[in-house]
Amino acid sequence: MKSKVLNYIKLARLDKPIGIYLLLWPSLLGLLLGTISEGYIDFENILIVLVGSVLVRSCGCVINDISDRNFDKVVERTKERPLASGNISLKEAWIFFIILSIASFCLLLLTPLLTLKIALFVSLLIILYPLSKRFLKAPQLILGITFGSGSVISYSLQSESFSLSIIILYFGLVAWIVSFDSFYALEDIDDDKKIGINSTPILWGGKTIFIANALHLVFYTSLLLIAYLNEFSIFFLLTMGILLILFYFQNQLAKKELYLDAFKTNNYIGLFAVLGFTAEIFFI
């Protein structure tokens, strides 16, 4: 029984929470922007965003493994995943996905109608992403659109009218997510070529790091624009300074071909962006 539970935990990647964090940070940034618009933050909305990030990321991991189960069996990094290794059957994985989806929908019933509509649309993208790797040259774009939508969903929890700031944030987040997932995909580029899976590193080739860096700087520019539009204090430049240091550190790791470590740096980038927004809104 214990080993079965552990396999379900691994199937949902709950043992590797960085994916939860990278979905959570965009969502919290959107929620914080909604707080600026409305002048308050509802504690219930924070809980919805926290729980929702766990459920949605878990759903995404399960449907991804269902879709990629035959590929995962022949890739060294993924062949021990519960579904690929046979520790969980396809039927069990589908049942688990349905349970997670129902739990996610029940959570959405606590939200405004606008939030529910946006989230249901985004749920289609969650299902589409694993398939997009087969027919889209840059599937990371679908991931960026999907993960970035967390900011819009959480913003709609706080505000029914969309501001210019949330639009800027959304496009900045899409650029950032495409950027950091391209670093992640560099780790698997040889296996992806072998099994016929598309990715931005395969599409961009030797220009991958340059383009990923350019997209990353688009994200930073979006943060500066939001700071200007919302009259953040001069202290926000301290946040941007920390983010630039992390950007430099990420590139040093990439130069050493430590792509997975470079990818993980983005967890801290998201964290400090959220802390910077929080400080400006509540304390400065």
Task: Please report, for each region that a protein language model flagged, where it lies by residue.
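Multi-pass alpha-helical membrane architecture of UbiA-family
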Residues: 1-284
